[in-house]
């Protein structure tokens, strides 16, 4: 499979997620609206590029005529090092898949993230662990989240007050990260729902 660009990966992920949630692919207009394209024609061009790369098939004559061809591997995707400016679940970040039942976690896990560092040591999240993550932006203060600040991904406990976000470590050797939402790019990538001790599954 040819590597996808960041934008192509976003379009592919949107089609896949829409299929999983509704049972049907999105229209070009829905893709354009969700991803901020100026017109459905822009969405069509990205779909044609995906078709040329062999990951989807465009069925002519139907507004929702999109069929996925890229086989989804079994298990939860394991995300390793994340490149700057790219979606967390971009294909190039996936190191492999682990046959873990997502329903073991509440809410269910969507992916695994390899933990880097000991900033969350005191609650049992250690360097090299595989953190089970539920993909959502619906999180509350006090929860452990996966967050992206500018182009850096981190795992911390969330505390939000107005335009200021405090990302709190669980290790006294580390300082909190303070984010001013008026000045920095900040995105919640998901909610931590469990830990797999690295080595138990590899």
UniProtKB/Swiss-Prot annotation:
Any GO CC annotation of this UniProt entry: protein-DNA complex
Residues within the DNA-binding region(s): 28-48
A single BP term in Gene Ontology: SOS response
MF-aspect GO terms: DNA-binding transcription repressor activity; sequence-specific DNA binding; serine-type endopeptidase activity
Pfam short name (any one): Peptidase_S24
UniProtKB keywords: Autocatalytic cleavage, DNA damage, DNA repair, DNA replication, DNA-binding, Hydrolase, Repressor, SOS response, Transcription, Transcription regulation
EC number: 3.4.21.88
Active site: 119 (for autocatalytic cleavage activity), 156 (for autocatalytic cleavage activity)
Keyword Transcription assigned: yes
Catalytic activity, as annotated: Hydrolysis of Ala-|-Gly bond in repressor LexA
Marked site: Cleavage: 84-85
SUPFAM superfamilies cross-referenced by the UniProt entry: LexA/Signal peptidase (SSF51306), Winged helix' DNA-binding domain (SSF46785)
Record has Hydrolase as a keyword: yes
Gene3D superfamilies noted in UniProt: Umud Fragment, subunit A (2.10.109.10), Winged helix-like DNA-binding domain superfamily/Winged helix DNA-binding domain (1.10.10.10)
Superkingdom field: Bacteria
Function field: Represses a number of genes involved in the response to DNA damage (SOS response), including recA and lexA. Binds to the 16 bp palindromic sequence 5'-CTGTATATATATACAG-3'. In the presence of single-stranded DNA, RecA interacts with LexA causing an autocatalytic cleavage which disrupts the DNA-binding part of LexA, leading to derepression of the SOS regulon and eventually DNA repair.
Self-association state and partner proteins as the record states: Homodimer.
Family indicated by similarity: Belongs to the peptidase S24 family.
Name this polypeptide is given: LexA repressor
Gene that this polypeptide is encoded by: lexA
């Amino acid at each position: 499979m040819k590597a996808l660009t960041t934008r192509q990966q976003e379009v592919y992920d949107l089609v896949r997620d829409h299929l999983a949630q509704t049972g049907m692919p999105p229209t070009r207009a829905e893709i354009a609206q969700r991803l901020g394209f100026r017109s459905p024609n822009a969405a069509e061009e990205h779909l044609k590029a995906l078709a040329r790369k062999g990951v989807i098939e465009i069925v002519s004559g139907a507004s929702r005529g999109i069929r996925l061809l890229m086989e989804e591997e079994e298990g939860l995707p394991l995300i390793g090092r994340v490149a700057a400016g790219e979606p967390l679940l971009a294909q190039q970040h996936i190191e492999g898949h682990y046959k873990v039942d997502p329903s073991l976690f509440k809410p269910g896990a969507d992916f695994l993230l390899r933990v880097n560092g000991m900033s969350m040591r005191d609650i049992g999240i250690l360097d090299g662990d595989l953190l089970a993550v539920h993909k959502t932006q619906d999180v509350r203060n006090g929860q452990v989240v996966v967050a992206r600040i500018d182009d850096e991904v981190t795992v911390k406990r969330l505390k939000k007050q107005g335009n200021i976000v405090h990302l709190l470590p669980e290790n006294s050797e580390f300082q909190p990260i303070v984010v001013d939402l008026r000045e920095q790019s900040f995105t919640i990538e998901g909610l931590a729902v469990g830990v797999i001790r690295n080595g138990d599954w590899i």
